[in-house]
Regions:
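Short glycine/proline-enriched loop/turn "hinge" motifs that connect secondary-structure elements
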Residues: 57, 64-67
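Active-site beta-strand-loop-beta-strand hairpin of nuclease catalytic cores
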Residues: 66-74
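Short, conserved beta-strand/beta-arch hydrophobic-aromatic motifs that form part
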Residues: 62-63, 76
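Basic, Lys/Arg-enriched alpha-helical interface segments
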Residues: 1-59, 71-72, 81-103
């Protein structure tokens, strides 16, 4: 399955520390390999069509993604600082998901 990365997500990932980037790449590789079957602790469904890729470490990194047209799309990334997903981050991911649906 192909993985498409939003340019903003790519910038976000490349700005992280090298060690964290390696963990992100490893986790994205797991997503590519296991697709829908990838579950906790690496992936969690957060809404009907939106999933959260969870990268644990010195920083808690979250990447929102979806499955669309037999591909995986990485929509948004952020550093998680609290227990709940910030609404601002969720809204942005849902907006990008909506854009995919209109294409």
């Amino acid at each position: 399955m192909n993985i498409y990365t939003n340019p903003e997500v790519e910038k976000f990932i490349l700005a992280l520390e090298k060690q964290t980037v390696a963990k992100v790449i490893r986790t994205v590789d797991l997503l590519e390999k296991f697709e829908h079957k990838l579950g906790l602790p690496h992936s969690k469904k957060v809404s009907k069509d939106l999933f959260e890729l969870r990268i644990r470490g010195k920083q808690e990194i979250r990447l929102f993604y979806c499955f669309h047209n037999k591909s995986i799309h990485l929509l948004h990334g952020f550093v998680k600082k609290s227990q709940k997903i910030p609404q601002k981050e969720m809204r942005l991911a849902l907006q990008r998901l909506k854009l995919l649906d209109t294409q």
